[in-house]
Amino acid sequence: MDATLALPLLIALIAIALFFDFLNGLHDAANSIATIVSTRVLRPQYAVMWAAFFNFIAFLFFGLHVAETLGKGIIDPTIVTPLVIFSALIGAIVWNIATWIFGIPSSSSHALIGGLVGAGLARTGGDAIVWTGLLKTVGAIFMSPMIGFFLALLLILIVSWLFVRQTPFAVDRTFRVMQFISASLYSLGHGGNDAQKTMGIIAVLLFSQGYLGSEFYVPFWVVITCQAAIALGTLFGGWRIVHTMGSKITKLNPMQGFCAETGGAITLFAATWLGIPVSTTHTITGAIIGVGAAKRVSAVRWGLAGNIVIAWFVTMPAAAAISALTYLAVDLFL
């Protein structure tokens, strides 16, 4: 398709992609602030502003490896058309809105990946999929919550041993301050990993239309607009999912909140540097369960945690189905 002729559609699709990025911040804001809110270190309105700031500046600390994975590591960029991107975004957005309405902390990341896969399959079948990249990402579905779980569990055991001689009041006071650091780190990881997914979508769209020349890369203006969109979404993040993530799964004190956020942040930092588009929802949920289980196994509301896990597994196929149906329906009229 000629790049000039596609310009109005291109602008509209970029706007839809940025809307998804905004929804990502809105939907996943809870991941960054759930623990600091549930421990009452910050009120929700101040916590979202804190998280939004660190979401925005995340591009200063990470490369663009995740954007490259989304742009050319899930589906073959040579088969990408505006309709493929449109369908992928619709699949992800519809699923995100549905889970946000019901307060279900599903993964925006895997909704987007599912949307891409569904649209790619609808266009050219299995040949559209970069199976090595997809399998690596699906593997991260299982690994990220487990890593978050074990890191948070290890941290809570180490910290509990180090502060065993301190009074509960002194420990609480110390970790109320430390949670500002851990929440900042987690918000950096959230902004660094999640915003890059939309960067990859916009960049591959530009590449498919000939705006990037012969080599795939992410323009700086795409980086800035995506970071701004996710930060703005975080600023308007909803309390429904904050409440689920921060208090319904397990009750947290400041020390536990610090360990959960730090374990989650380490996982996100490593994944972002490796170019793996993991789920911030999976990561922080695993970490929260880890600190709850360290207290006692019964401290975790396993029934609710199980419902969340089911939502994780449903997300990719559900978004893929919505995306594929969108592609086939629109294609009938083109």
Label each region the model flagged:
Residues 1-334:
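Multi-pass alpha-helical transmembrane bundle typical of ion/small-solute transporters
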